[in-house]
UniProtKB/Swiss-Prot annotation:
GO terms for cellular component: cytoplasm; nucleolus. Component of the small ribosomal subunit, ribosomal RNA processing complex (SSU RRP complex). Residues 1-25, 37-74 are annotated as: Disordered. The keyword RNA-binding applies. Keywords: Cytoplasm, Nucleus, Ribosome biogenesis, RNA-binding. Pfam families: KH_PNO1_2nd. Residues 49-61 have a biased composition (Acidic residues). This is Pre-rRNA-processing protein PNO1.
């Protein structure tokens, strides 16, 4: 055992492992890679991207404007829509009797139609054969016109003519102080004896009028509806039928001159 005051000897260093010698083959590969990298950096054409093929190039005309392929006609995606038109109870029997006269809804508008007797309504639905976007609304107007009381032939005119409209108003809105007796008298003044006054207004203004209780429905062109409404309002307010007839004759003569 050495003395405590003796000098300590440093521990022996571990034997260093000899590094593996690089073979000649690895040296050759390193030299080749270095030479290729240097050639790539010095070559100006090496960094350019590959040229596009003729297929990817955009075709242009003589003025330099691009030419595109003609567009294809693609049918738009149509959403199936439905309409449910309620039918008053007093019009259900007329609807059943005239149901065979409803082919224009299928032939002209290309709609699917069915009568829901339990719910008392007519249901319309567009299909893949429906061409016009307005066909469903035209069919709904047709059924609504029949439900209001118009004749089936007059309602079919809504499908064939785009210039026809329906306007409704209440007699009580014209004269709000009408009592039960005054309301019946106003309706009688509009209709006339055996319906002569109503027919005279229809023939002079080329419209169709339906009296349903206190409601008045007018079918016709926009200007014609305005003239018929003025005549009806005059009768409700108490104008003499003779004066209204004279105004209708003037209106009829003006319409003949215009057309």
């Amino acid at each position: 055992m050495p003395a405590p005051t003796a000098l300590k000897q440093p521990p022996p260093a571990p034997e260093q492992q000899a590094a593996p010698a690089i073979t000649n083959e690895n040296e050759d590969e390193l030299l080749i890679d270095i030479q290729q990298a240097a050639a790539t950096l010095t070559d100006p054409n090496a960094a350019e991207p590959p040229e596009e093929t003729m297929e990817n190039e955009m075709a242009v005309d003589e003025e330099g404007r691009p030419r595109f392929a003609p567009g294809k006609n693609i049918d738009p995606i149509r959403r199936i829509e439905t309409r449910k038109i309620p039918i008053p109870p007093h019009r259900m029997s007329a609807l059943k009797a005239n149901w065979t006269k409803y082919p224009p809804l299928v032939d002209h508008c290309k709609l699917q139609v069915r009568m829901n007797i339990k719910e008392k309504r007519v249901e319309l639905r567009s299909s893949k054969y429906t061409v016009s976007n307005e066909a469903l609304q035209m069919g709904a107007d047709f059924v609504s016109a029949f439900a209001m009381g118009f004749d089936i032939d007059d309602a079919i005119a809504l499908l064939r003519l785009d210039s026809l409209y329906i306007q409704s108003f209440d007699i009580k809105d014209v004269r709000q102080t009408l009592g039960p007796d005054a309301l019946s008298r106003a309706i009688g003044r509009i209709a006339g004896k055996d319906g002569k006054t109503k027919f005279a207004i229809e023939n002079a203004t080329k419209t169709r009028i339906v009296l349903a209780g206190s409601k008045v429905h007018i079918l016709g062109a926009f200007e014609n509806i305005g003239m018929a409404r003025e005549s009806i309002v005059s009768l409700v307010l108490g104008a003499q039928p003779g004066k209204v007839y004279n105004n209708l004759r003037i209106i009829a003569s003006r319409m003949k001159e215009r057309w």
